[in-house]
C-alpha cells in the first residue's frame, strides 16, 4: 500500500563531493548553520567491524556531503561533536565505524552518538515487521526508499559498482 503523504521530493538535492580543503571548510560551515536532523552513512570496504571506512556521507533533505574521512577528518569530527540529532539506517554499524574511525580519548563515545541517533531500520520494523517474502515491504534501504520516497529512484549502490 502506497502512502503518498510520506513521499518526500528529492528534486533540488545537491550532493557535494569533498575534494579539497575549501570543500571541507564548506561542509563544516554547513554543519554550523544548525539543522534539525542530519542523516549519516558510512561506506566500508566490507561488512565486518574491521572493514575500513572509505566514505562518510551526511546531509539533510536538500544538501549532502560525501568525503574520504582519511583525507578530510575535520568535518567528520565536527559532526561527531555537534549536538544535532542524527538518523541512520542500521545505526549501530555506522556509529561503531564512526567511533572507531575517530578513535581519540576526547571524542564522543559510541553511547553518546547512539543516544542522539534514530535508526530507520528499527522504525521500518515497527511500521511493518514482515519481510518482503512474507508480504511486507522489506527492511532494506532500497526497498524502503522505493516505497516511501520514489519508486523510480536509481539504485546508487548498483550504479557505483557499474
Give names to the regions the model predicted.
Residues 1-42:
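N-terminal accessory regions of nucleic-acid-interacting proteins
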Residues 2-19, 51-162:
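Active-site-proximal helix-loop-helix substrate-binding element of RNase H-like nuclease domains
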Residues 31, 47-49, 111:
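Sterically constrained small-residue positions within well-ordered secondary structures
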Amino acid at each position: 500500500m502506497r502512502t503518498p503523504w510520506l513521499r518526500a521530493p528529492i528534486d533540488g538535492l545537491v550532493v557535494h563531493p569533498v575534494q579539497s580543503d575549501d570543500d571541507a571548510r564548506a561542509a563544516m560551515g554547513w554543519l554550523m548553520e544548525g539543522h534539525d536532523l542530519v542523516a549519516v552513512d558510512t561506506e566500508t570496504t566490507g561488512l565486518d567491524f574491521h572493514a575500513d571506512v572509505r566514505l562518510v556521507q551526511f546531509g539533510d533533505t536538500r544538501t549532502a556531503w560525501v568525503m574520504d574521512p582519511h583525507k578530510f577528518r575535520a568535518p567528520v569530527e565536527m559532526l561527531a561533536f555537534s549536538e544535532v540529532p542524527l538518523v541512520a539506517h542500521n545505526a549501530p554499524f555506522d556509529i561503531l565505524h564512526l567511533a572507531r574511525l575517530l578513535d581519540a580519548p576526547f571524542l564522543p563515545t559510541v553511547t553518546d552518538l547512539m543516544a542522539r541517533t534514530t535508526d530507520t531500520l528499527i522504525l521500518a520494523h515497527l511500521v511493518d515487521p514482515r519481510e518482503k517474502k512474507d508480504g511486507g515491504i522489506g527492511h532494506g534501504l532500497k526497498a524502503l526508499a522505493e516505497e516511501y520516497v520514489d519508486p523510480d529512484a536509481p539504485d546508487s549502490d548498483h550504479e557505483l559498482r557499474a
